[in-house]
Amino acid sequence: MPIIADFDDLAPAELLLVLSLSRKTGRVTAVRGDQKIVLTLRNGSIVYAASPAIRERLGDILVKRGAISEHNLQRALDRQGLLLEPKVLGTILVELGLVSTAVVHQAVFSQFEAVIRQLLTWDRGELNFQSSEVPDVGAYLIDPVELLVVIGYDGLGPLVKGLVRLALKRPAAKTA
């Protein structure tokens, strides 16, 4: 089920909430001029968020916060490069006992939050959602509803606020 809409017809927050509530899997692309933001969702949770304007990677965030050393980051990256099956860095760091799942989840959350904050500042643009397979590579699942609550949704319309309230009442999705 592809969705293509201008921001005038469907706000990014509204699309995220609909995709979250309906537990959709696929890719959201938001474009404004030459700027592009990409989000990947699996069962309604964000597993990937990227923007050329926000380049801070997970390992760098964890080093900056003092959660891991540069040496241990490199150790995990080296191991990741040797794996035959893809696996996200956060999972490798946890498996090596270098950091807790909670610390990685918190860092991934802040990484995705920065991308969503940027998207919510756009006043115009086009949204495109395409259903697609998203392999489970051990990614951390971030609930878009939780992100919108943390960011604050005072400026959003009544439909979005109602959807957020509804989404907060549903059972939580399992996280990796």
Task: For every predicted segment, state its role.
Residues 1-176:
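Acidic, Ser/Thr/Pro-enriched low-complexity segments and adjacent helix/loop capping patches
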